[in-house]
Amino acid sequence: MTEKLYEQDSMLKSCLATVLSCAEDKGGYAVVLDRTVFFPEGGGQLSDRGTLGGVKMTYAAQRGSEVVHYCERPLPVGVQVEAVLDWQARLDHMQQHAGEHILSHAVWKLFGANNIGFHMGERLVTIDLDKELTAAELEQAEDYANSQIWEDKPITVSYLPHTELSALVMRKKNEKLTGMLRIVTVADGDICTCCGTHPVRTGMIGLIRINRFDKHKDGIRVEFLCGRWALEDARRKNEYIWQAGRLLSMKPEGVPQGLRKLQEEVTGLNERLKAQTAKLYEFLAPQLLAQAAVDEGGIKYVAAAQEDCNAADAKLLLNKLLADGRTVAAVVYRSGERINFVVGSGEQTQADCRSLCSLAGGLFGGRGGGSQHFAQGGGAYGDDWRQKVLQLQQLLKE
């Protein structure tokens, strides 16, 4: 059994501990101590990390009554080592977890929304709510949550028999929990059963910032950050806005309007380009058909190589080649280090584009698929790709 010092004192940064066991596991070494300051991943919170006797410890996990520490090198059984937390990582995790409690309490108190899911990743924290809230309501909850932080209220840990849980006013109660329960309380605020680590005062959280929310099942998923993670995220995004402003020759507050104007201009240019491309293909298609191979029944077979082309343009040219219903055609175009192709057959032909696509895939070292009258695929780029297009035209006829 491992004594979990973090449960009583989340501010403890190191301790002396005895190595009870050490075994190779998961490409490293699984070490069990008689006592630890390292919180193992669980309850939505990330694992602590740090060092054991100077050896890097990257992950801690709960295994029954033991905490297993995964280290880069083995440690001798029976020796005493110093366990030292990566304190910045611990503080980051505590800020997120305590912030989650406070934000969850805010949406519950103000709008009756319940937190039914919590996830903490690296620089990403989410809660799932069982009802939909508006952006204005979430902003109100964010303001309330931050007011709880700035009042610098105590956060305390206590233990209570499960039989006395009903006496507490809690936003959620897990009736399946039995025995002595660990209760985390924010003064005059959230009360919750929790196994995680938390700062001793709300002021240590610093800040809660909601970044986005999306529809999720019958409610919403709220993405937010707290403390240092929130500060660094805000710095990055502020720099993005300033960079956009410099590119647009505008102040930051003018960026949205500038982007809308730029988007309108790009949309207009794309429409003009699309119209010009259609005119070009009206001119190009007859030229390609004039060079097509023709069988005894008058069915034409043509393969076109296009350098400056995208998928939409390729399909547009293909449709113009197939317009008479008596043509089998392929348009092959380069996209970076890949060759892509679309294959089509007119309604009056017997060609199966799935088979033709396989032929093209064989030529270009790739694959594809589709239906009888249309298929598409791709392969690796080679300097001889244009010569292979000529071969493909003959294969289409055969």
Spans of features found by a protein language model:
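Conserved nucleotide-binding/hydrolysis modules and their immediate coupling elements
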Residues: 1-79
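A generic structural motif
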Residues: 30-31, 64-73, 125-131, 373-380
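Active/ligand-binding-proximal structured segments within catalytic/core domains
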Residues: 36-52, 76-127, 372-373
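Short beta-strand
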Residues: 59, 116-120, 212-213, 330-334, ...
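Functional cores that coordinate and move charged inorganic groups
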Residues: 89, 108-218
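Glycine-rich, acidic loop segments that terminate in or are immediately followed by a histidine
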Residues: 193-205, 228, 302-398
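A conserved active-site cap/scaffold subdomain adjacent to cofactor or substrate pockets
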Residues: 199, 211-258
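Hydrophobic helix-and-loop "lid/oligomerization" segment in the mid-to-C-terminal part
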Residues: 242-337
